[in-house]
Amino acid sequence: MKLWGGRFTKPTNELVDEYASSIQFDKKLAAYDIEGSLAHVAMLKKCEIIPAEDADKIAEGLKIVLSKIEAGEAELSNEHEDIHMNVEKLLIDEVGPVGGRLHTGRSRNDQVALDMRLYLRDVIAELSDLLKAVQQSLITQAKANMDTVMPGYTHLQRAQPVLFAHHMMAYVFMFQRDVERFQDSLKRVNKSPLGAGALAGTTFPIDRHFVAEQLGFDGICENSLDAVSDRDFVVEFLSNSALVSTHLSRLCEELVQWSSAEFNFVELDDSFTTGSSMMPQKKNPDVAELVRGKTGRVYGHLMGMLTTLKGLPLAYNKDMQEDKEGMFDAHETLKGALQLFAPMMESMKVNKESMYKAVSNDYSNATDLADYLVNKGMTFRESHAVVGEAVLHCIEQNKYLLDLTLKEFKQYSEVIDEDIFDVLKPEAVVNARSVEGGTAKESVLQQIAKAEKLLESAK
């Protein structure tokens, strides 16, 4: 008989038990469920709601139940629906009818909200640490490539030369925002819903703040209806995870391109690539492709959660059982990607010569010729038109700007002098952009110093 079965005259259909059960996935919350129950029973003892002897017996029984679950010795059954009822049934089997006192002043509605908040609190800390490791791997690559010049792109067309280190640092700061978003979300995650009951609170003289303090929460959810209805914190976690996945996917797209023969900018280590069952020569960037591909899973979980919530009246509805699998899978998917990413980036080889060749054989120094003419007195629009004509001439003659003679340059403007050849070199183009945040070496070094300071302060 189910623990809530007193009002019913017949057992639940076996197919309903199987369909409605969540134990196959919410068993992941077992340790958090028991952690919450230990705090709850300590509060029941403190407030003299149940006898101290019973509370102590329940607490010891919960610890035994946890050890059995962790050892794989506990039988978790669809008949008891979810982790909460399974734990309570195991507790009663362990300590007898006194275990039935545990649920005094509590509902599964506030209990599950508590478990999920405890779970996400740990997950956010774990993912934040993994993100910092990825940031450090990118900084390591940046430091090793302070003199590596590559094409910068807009519209996937070569635009202006940049340092490879500058490109790496762009992602460092993207991931920094991701860490900050996760950390900021803790303000909303780290509130205790316990004591809200099913929806309206409880008639027992409980101490919600005691439970919150025992569990390390910053405070309590202020409204009992909101406490059991709220899944904003799950949506926010999924949204933050989707943004991390977006940033990882963008970098993976570049790694896939850069590692191709068409670019030949980087070589991923053999340990992060795979071969072909048919083509012996192949070295495929499967890890980068999978990280890119699995981003869709995380997006899907976010949309699924929003869609589940959009039509729900207050307070708890069984639809909300669907809030966990997406949360669990988003965590595991993102965790797997981040665990692979740092060592993949650290072991990646950068083809400096290929990058330099690419940036030399193009027109990405055209803006610098235009800026040069502005400094000689032209308006930017005038210089833009003049340089456009020069580029067109080069294209027609199968030349690049640095292939032109001074005489040819002067056909476009008499103000151009011999110094133009130094101005248009890739290294000069890069180092001319010394504005804060720019691609010049001194600017990138400042970015690295700031990023390292942020990582150090987060320890």
From Swiss-Prot:
* Cellular component terms (Gene Ontology): cytosol
> What EC number is given for this enzyme?
4.3.2.1
Cysteine disulfide partners in this protein:
none
Q: Where is the signal peptide?
A: none
Keywords per UniProt: Amino-acid biosynthesis, Arginine biosynthesis, Cytoplasm, Lyase
Q: Record's superkingdom?
A: Bacteria
Q: Which Gene3D superfamilies match?
A: Fumarase/aspartase (C-terminal domain) (1.10.40.30), Fumarase/aspartase (Central domain) (1.20.200.10), Fumarase/aspartase (N-terminal domain) (1.10.275.10)
| Keyword presence, Lipid metabolism | no
Alphabetical GO biological process terms: arginine biosynthetic process via ornithine; L-arginine biosynthetic process
Catalyzed chemical reaction(s):
2-(N(omega)-L-arginino)succinate = fumarate + L-arginine
Q: Name one Pfam family in it.
A: ASL_C2
Q: Which PROSITE patterns match?
A: FUMARATE_LYASES
By its UniProt entry, which InterPro entries does this protein fall under?
A: Arg_succ_lyase_C, Argininosuccinate_lyase, Fumarase/histidase_N, Fumarate_lyase_CS, Fumarate_lyase_fam, Fumarate_lyase_N, L-Aspartase-like
**Which molecular-function annotation in GO is an example for this chain?**
argininosuccinate lyase activity
Q: Where in the cell is it found?
A: Cytoplasm
**What pathway is this protein said to act in by its record?**
Amino-acid biosynthesis; L-arginine biosynthesis; L-arginine from L-ornithine and carbamoyl phosphate: step 3/3
* NCBIfam families reported in the protein's UniProt record: argH
**Family that this chain belongs to:** Belongs to the lyase 1 family. Argininosuccinate lyase subfamily.
In Swiss-Prot or TrEMBL terms, this protein is called Argininosuccinate lyase
